[in-house]
Amino acid sequence: MIKLNEYETSLSERLLISLHNLCATSGEMARRSDDLAQIVQTDVNTVNQCMDKHVSDGYVVSYFDNEGNRRFYLTSRGIIRVCSLFS
């Protein structure tokens, strides 16, 4: 079983887990990239690069809000991916 702490999971996985823990599973609950960067303690560009891969894999949806902030939320496929980390 994977232990879910910062030393045993990749940044990519921590971002998915963070979205899940924040209940970011719809557009209304989407989280800004700068918020995620603060949570995982990295810079916004790194978050955006990781999240671009998750978008292409179908795990995450990305959009820009009215203020120009990039936001992300998990798709159903992303939720399944996060749950698979726990088994």
Model-derived regions, located:
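Minor-groove-contacting beta-hairpin "wing" of winged helix-turn-helix DNA-binding domains
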Residues: E67-L74
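Short amphipathic alpha-helical interaction segments
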Residues: Q41-S56
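Short, amphipathic alpha-helical interaction segments positioned at domain boundaries
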Residues: S76-S87
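A short, conserved structural fragment
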Residues: V55-D65
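Short, locally clustered residues in the helix-turn-helix/winged-helix DNA-binding domain
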Residues: I17-A24, F86
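Short acidic, hydrophobic short linear motifs in intrinsically disordered regions
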Residues: T25-Q38
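Short alpha-helical segments that sit at the start of domains
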Residues: M1-S18
